[in-house]
UniProtKB/Swiss-Prot annotation:
Subunit organization: Part of the 30S ribosomal subunit. Contacts proteins S5 and S12.
Organism, as annotated: Symbiobacterium thermophilum (strain DSM 24528 / JCM 14929 / IAM 14863 / T)
Gene name linked to the record: rpsH
Statement: the UniProt record of this protein carries the keyword rRNA-binding: yes
Classification of source organism: Bacteria, Bacillati, Bacillota, Clostridia, Eubacteriales
One GO-annotated biological process of the protein: translation
Cited Gene3D superfamilies: 3.30.1370.30, 3.30.1490.10
Membership in a protein family: Belongs to the universal ribosomal protein uS8 family.
Database matches in NCBIfam families: PRK00136.1
The protein's name: Small ribosomal subunit protein uS8
Amino acid sequence: MVVSDPIADLLTRIRNANLAYHDRVDVPGSKMKKAIVQIMKDEGFIRDFEWIDNGHQGVIRIYLKYGPNKTRVISGLRRISKPGLRVYAKRDQIPRVLGGLGIAILSTSKGVMTDKQARQQGLGGEVLCYIW
């Protein structure tokens, strides 16, 4: 299946699995998706992930995280920069998500990182998505 926006597809699959209380979700793999999922793990939004080599593209298996009584850890995911409308932020214009409760994921010249890391390093870049 050809997907015009792979990052939006990743976020939609995670959102749908989260709303259905699934334990895991499989998404087609890429370096960019792996970097985004690694940030989600480091920030505590998912439990874990693994790369499954299937001979060509690879698959990322994401293990979702829930709190006590099956409360969702991920409240929302939003794609910001889209193929039809790219959104860039200078280093002093990096957005804060819910006053610092969520994260913005940026693609910078030094790789994919959170809004906090980009501010610390003084970098701007493409705002990929918000997670809260």
